[in-house]
Amino acid sequence: MKKRTLLSLMGATALSFGALATTALAENPTDLNVAIVLSAGLESPWDGTLIEAFERTKTEKPHGLDISWTYTDPLWGDDAGDAMRLFAESGEFDIIWAHSTYSDQVEKMQAEFPDILFVVVGSGNEGLGGNQYWVYKRVHEPAYAIGVLAGQMTETNTLGVVGSFPADDVNDEINAFFNGARSVNPDIIQKVAFIESWYDPAKAAEMTSAQIATGADMIFSLAANFQPCEEAEILCFANFADQHSFSPTTVLTSVLANWDPDVNYIVDEWWAYKTDGAAYDGNTEIVWRGMSEGGAALAPFYELADKVPAEAKAVFDQTLADIMSGAFVVELDVAVPTSD
């Protein structure tokens, strides 16, 4: 009798554990809803490349999730904070991804919405930790590589860069570009200008034309206007997105920002919180993913490949290989660059 009772209890216990396991499995989330606060608009490579990364991630379906998102027009300050609060209070969103300097806004609400994972991006943010994650994007490695190319191809020894703002994650790639150029050509003269905006094509054209007038025969444009290069019939480099199609006769290659590993990291953190009960543990220090981790890359030369001399291409290819293998580490220099 006692044996029969014990077996019955064991059976009931096994059934209970089985039911719990089935319930836990059934409760795993199948949908992930993300609200994205944009800073410059989809026409800007900074914002446009993020949405492209989300589209690729949606196709890959990490953890079997159906990922959906909504995004705002460009918002800053109180307007951005108001939008984030509306998203949070709606109860419809699991992640609020604020795609620039928004830690001030997050700080005012992160404790109030502990189940929401907040993301801020780039320089100017504060590492709050907890349920705020700080994504950083550095593309100084491919910028160095195109500098190696430009340093060999320039005929005037004068190279120009038109940047957005003199921010930490802008300065790094400008300095890397010129360091790469000087690694193969110590006579390089650098010209630097900032449009003081995340996106202003007219100002970018003005600055680019001024640099060309001073003798720059190759331009690295972080500001996405290539018309002056077309008019001067010189080659240029684009930034953050593959912009060759915008100017096929001038954009030799583009430095690429790939947000895919960052998006997947955030999805994994949210998934662990939802399924394992792991506490959010947002980083308080800068974390970035370089070329070897898939966070940065370079676009092809396309039909302009024959413009690149074989010797210059060989040095360029070796530089990329050394960066990818870790044999060469590109110096991280965030000092504000100036013209010679």
Could you say what each language-model-derived stretch is?
Residues 6-7:
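N-terminal export leaders
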Residues 11-13:
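Repetitive helical segments and hydrophobic/amphipathic motifs
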Residues 26-340:
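A residue-level marker of the well-folded mature domains of exported/periplasmic proteins
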Residues 1-2:
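N-terminal secretory signal peptides that target proteins for export/translocation
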Residues 15-24:
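C-terminal segment of classical bacterial N-terminal signal peptides
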